[in-house]
């Protein structure tokens, strides 16, 4: 069995310093060794609990500390989540990610979260959640419910992190990733560009991710969505070439991971997105809203896919659509009615 490469910051910086076209070419070569370059994984992200988060992440509209005009909402009812998942599947998504604006899940919410996972899986979709910090018991319960992926981003480098967040340490994030991995759940973890970081911070963040005991199976790279009312609302835009470079370096350093274009895609031109796919991005979030920010519409995505000759990746499942529907209906029929309909309470 081959051992995973341990990356140094010097090596990562050297990749960032490569001539742009050479870097993209190398990234595309690496990409083709592990993935079909014509396939794009399509994921949908739903905010199942919005706003009133106690954390102070300076980029986030969901923080209760900033006046962004975002209306807080309680945890969605399970039935609402399943209806959204059905629509996402019909639109072509194979993975459904559920995000909640919490520091960590409350124990009273765990049964509803577990049920969401079970019923989305009954649709034949991959499941992902992002709920903040987890303890060992919570990670184990989500794993037993069948959760495929857990998202918990590192955001930036350890050195720059304290300039962006003070209510949760970098080690807290690494500890949550360890708990997720130990529970048998796949890891989704990436970062954000445009926070005011330097190239060395982008390199250091990717080194942290690549050098985890096992690199994340999924690496979302976000471009800061500047939200009025947050401390970073007036930050400078990220140069598209710098964003593409980061995608390419992520692909080279984590060759077997899905590299996802996440927040900020609404602001990207088709040409920038195309270069990102050339640089090794092979996953997108799909749909009208990405938590609390806009995202390109499905029609625009389909048009771009056609222009580039790309196809949405299909998820292999063991059950046919009718079997999946039968499983879902049976799961609903067996549910405690009060829990199913009053998950928001």
UniProtKB/Swiss-Prot annotation:
Specify the domain of life of the species encoding this protein: Bacteria
- The protein's annotated pathway: Cofactor biosynthesis; biotin biosynthesis; biotin from 7,8-diaminononanoate: step 2/2
Q: By what name is this protein known? A: Biotin synthase
Q: Which HAMAP family match?
A: BioB
Please list the cofactors this protein needs.
Answer: [4Fe-4S] cluster; [2Fe-2S] cluster
Name a GO molecular-function annotation: 2 iron, 2 sulfur cluster binding
Kindly state which keywords UniProt assigns to this record, in alphabetical order. 2Fe-2S, 4Fe-4S, Biotin biosynthesis, Iron, Iron-sulfur, Metal-binding, S-adenosyl-L-methionine, Transferase
Q: Which residues bind [2Fe-2S] cluster?
A: 97, 128, 188, 260
What are the residue boundaries of the Radical SAM core domain, all occurrences included? Answer: 38-256
Pfam families named among the record's database cross-references: BATS, Radical_SAM
Function statement: Catalyzes the conversion of dethiobiotin (DTB) to biotin by the insertion of a sulfur atom into dethiobiotin via a radical-based mechanism.
Family (UniProt): Belongs to the radical SAM superfamily. Biotin synthase family.
What's the record's note on cofactor binding?
Binds 1 [4Fe-4S] cluster. The cluster is coordinated with 3 cysteines and an exchangeable S-adenosyl-L-methionine.
- List positions binding [4Fe-4S] cluster: 53, 57, 60
């Amino acid at each position: 069995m081959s051992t995973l490469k341990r990356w140094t910051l010097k090596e990562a910086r050297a990749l960032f310093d490569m001539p742009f076209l050479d870097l993209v070419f190398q990234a595309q070569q690496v990409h083709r060794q592990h993935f079909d370059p014509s396939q794009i994984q399509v994921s949908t992200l739903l905010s199942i609990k919005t706003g009133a988060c106690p954390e102070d992440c300076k980029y986030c509209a969901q923080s209760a500390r900033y006046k962004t005009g975002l209306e807080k909402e309680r945890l969605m009812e399970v039935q609402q989540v399943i209806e959204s998942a059905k629509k996402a599947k019909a639109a072509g998504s194979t993975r459904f990610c559920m995000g909640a604006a919490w520091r960590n899940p409350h124990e009273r919410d765990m049964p509803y979260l577990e049920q969401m996972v079970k019923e989305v899986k009954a649709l034949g979709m991959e499941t992902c959640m992002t709920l903040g910090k987890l303890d060992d018991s919570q990670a184990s319960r989500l794993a037993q419910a069948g959760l495929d992926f857990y998202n918990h981003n590192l955001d930036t480098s350890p050195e720059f992190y304290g300039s962006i967040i003070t209510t949760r340490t970098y080690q807290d994030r690494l500890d949550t990733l360890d708990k997720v991995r130990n529970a048998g759940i796949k890891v989704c973890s990436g970062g954000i560009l445009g926070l005011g970081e330097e190239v060395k911070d982008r390199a250091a963040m990717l080194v942290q991710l690549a050098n985890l005991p096992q690199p994340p199976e999924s690496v979302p790279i976000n471009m800061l969505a500047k939200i009025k009312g947050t401390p970073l609302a007036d930050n400078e835009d990220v140069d598209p070439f710098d964003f593409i470079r980061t995608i390419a370096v992520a692909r080279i350093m984590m060759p077997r991971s899905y590299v996802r274009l996440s927040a900020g895609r609404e602001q990207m031109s088709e040409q920038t997105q195309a270069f990102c796919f050339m640089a090794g991005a092979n996953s997108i979030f799909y749909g009208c809203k990405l938590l609390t920010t806009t995202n390109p519409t499905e029609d625009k995505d389909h048009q771009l896919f056609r222009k580039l000759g790309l196809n949405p990746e299909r998820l292999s499942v063991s059950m046919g659509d009718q079997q999946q529907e039968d499983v879902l209906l049976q799961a609903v029929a067996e549910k405690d009615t009060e829990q199913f309909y009053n998950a928001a309470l």
